[in-house]
Protein backbone atom coordinates (compact mmCIF):
# COMPACT_ATOMS: atom_id res chain seq x y z
CA UNK A 1 0.00 0.00 0.00
CA UNK A 2 1.35 3.41 -0.97
CA UNK A 3 2.03 5.93 1.78
CA UNK A 4 -0.21 8.97 1.47
CA UNK A 5 1.32 10.98 4.30
CA UNK A 6 2.69 14.37 3.35
CA UNK A 7 5.65 16.14 4.92
CA UNK A 8 6.20 19.88 4.56
CA UNK A 9 9.88 20.86 4.35
CA UNK A 10 10.97 24.50 4.60
CA UNK A 11 14.62 25.53 4.15
CA UNK A 12 16.19 28.56 2.48
CA UNK A 13 19.22 26.56 1.31
CA UNK A 14 18.17 25.02 -2.03
CA UNK A 15 20.72 22.20 -1.75
CA UNK A 16 19.55 21.26 1.76
CA UNK A 17 15.92 21.52 0.66
CA UNK A 18 16.47 19.26 -2.36
CA UNK A 19 18.47 16.70 -0.35
CA UNK A 20 15.95 16.58 2.49
CA UNK A 21 13.04 16.28 0.06
CA UNK A 22 14.86 13.53 -1.87
CA UNK A 23 15.51 11.57 1.32
CA UNK A 24 11.96 11.96 2.63
CA UNK A 25 10.48 10.84 -0.71
CA UNK A 26 12.81 7.82 -0.61
CA UNK A 27 11.35 6.99 2.81
CA UNK A 28 7.99 6.69 1.01
CA UNK A 29 6.40 10.00 1.96
CA UNK A 30 4.99 12.76 -0.23
CA UNK A 31 6.69 16.13 0.16
CA UNK A 32 5.73 19.76 -0.21
CA UNK A 33 8.65 22.19 -0.14
CA UNK A 34 9.04 25.89 0.54
CA UNK A 35 12.15 28.07 0.35
CA UNK A 36 11.29 30.60 3.07
CA UNK A 37 9.11 31.29 6.08
CA UNK A 38 6.57 33.28 4.06
CA UNK A 39 6.11 30.51 1.50
CA UNK A 40 5.84 27.97 4.32
CA UNK A 41 3.11 30.06 5.96
CA UNK A 42 1.21 30.28 2.66
CA UNK A 43 1.29 26.49 2.30
CA UNK A 44 0.19 26.01 5.91
CA UNK A 45 -2.80 28.29 5.31
CA UNK A 46 -4.07 25.84 2.66
CA UNK A 47 -2.63 22.43 3.53
CA UNK A 48 -2.46 20.36 6.71
CA UNK A 49 0.75 18.32 6.48
CA UNK A 50 1.17 15.11 8.46
CA UNK A 51 4.57 16.35 9.69
CA UNK A 52 6.66 19.48 9.14
CA UNK A 53 10.44 19.92 8.98
CA UNK A 54 11.77 23.48 9.32
CA UNK A 55 15.20 25.04 9.11
CA UNK A 56 15.69 27.40 12.05
CA UNK A 57 17.44 30.37 10.44
CA UNK A 58 16.01 31.55 7.16
CA UNK A 59 15.07 35.16 6.39
CA UNK A 60 15.04 35.77 10.15
CA UNK A 61 17.08 34.12 12.88
CA UNK A 62 13.92 32.64 14.37
CA UNK A 63 11.95 31.74 11.22
CA UNK A 64 11.80 28.05 12.13
CA UNK A 65 10.54 28.82 15.62
CA UNK A 66 7.87 31.13 14.18
CA UNK A 67 6.75 28.48 11.68
CA UNK A 68 6.66 25.90 14.47
CA UNK A 69 4.51 28.17 16.61
CA UNK A 70 2.09 28.90 13.75
CA UNK A 71 1.90 25.23 12.78
CA UNK A 72 1.11 24.12 16.34
CA UNK A 73 -1.45 26.91 16.76
CA UNK A 74 -3.37 25.86 13.63
CA UNK A 75 -2.64 22.10 13.71
CA UNK A 76 -1.72 21.14 17.31
CA UNK A 77 -1.36 17.45 16.46
CA UNK A 78 1.08 17.92 13.55
CA UNK A 79 4.60 16.92 14.64
CA UNK A 80 7.34 19.47 13.94
CA UNK A 81 11.06 18.81 13.51
CA UNK A 82 13.55 21.68 13.47
CA UNK A 83 16.74 20.81 11.59
CA UNK A 84 19.52 23.38 11.87
CA UNK A 85 23.23 24.02 12.04
CA UNK A 86 22.80 26.82 14.59
CA UNK A 87 24.14 24.77 17.49
CA UNK A 88 27.32 23.76 15.72
CA UNK A 89 27.93 27.18 14.15
CA UNK A 90 27.11 29.46 17.08
CA UNK A 91 27.47 27.23 20.08
CA UNK A 92 23.85 27.96 21.05
CA UNK A 93 22.04 25.04 22.60
CA UNK A 94 18.31 24.50 22.70
CA UNK A 95 16.67 21.67 24.56
CA UNK A 96 13.16 20.39 24.30
CA UNK A 97 13.73 18.68 27.65
CA UNK A 98 13.91 21.83 29.81
CA UNK A 99 10.84 23.76 30.89
CA UNK A 100 12.06 27.16 29.72
CA UNK A 101 12.92 26.09 26.18
CA UNK A 102 9.87 23.82 25.86
CA UNK A 103 7.57 26.77 26.63
CA UNK A 104 8.65 28.77 23.59
CA UNK A 105 10.02 26.14 21.21
CA UNK A 106 6.92 24.60 19.68
CA UNK A 107 8.71 21.67 18.09
CA UNK A 108 8.62 17.97 18.84
CA UNK A 109 12.21 17.28 17.84
CA UNK A 110 15.33 19.36 17.36
CA UNK A 111 18.06 17.89 15.12
CA UNK A 112 21.39 19.30 13.96
CA UNK A 113 21.97 19.49 10.18
CA UNK A 114 24.14 16.73 8.88
CA UNK A 115 21.72 14.17 10.28
CA UNK A 116 22.12 10.83 8.56
CA UNK A 117 19.14 9.76 6.43
CA UNK A 118 18.55 6.67 8.60
CA UNK A 119 18.40 8.84 11.74
CA UNK A 120 15.97 11.24 10.08
CA UNK A 121 13.84 8.32 8.89
CA UNK A 122 13.74 6.89 12.40
CA UNK A 123 12.69 10.25 13.92
CA UNK A 124 9.97 10.80 11.30
CA UNK A 125 8.58 7.30 11.83
CA UNK A 126 8.66 7.75 15.61
CA UNK A 127 6.74 11.04 15.43
CA UNK A 128 4.22 9.61 12.95
CA UNK A 129 3.95 6.44 15.05
CA UNK A 130 4.82 4.23 12.09
Tell what function each PLM region has:
Residues 47-53, 58:
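Active-site beta3 strand of CheY-like receiver
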Residues 42, 65-76, 96-99:
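Short amphipathic alpha-helix used as the core "switch/output" element in two-component signaling
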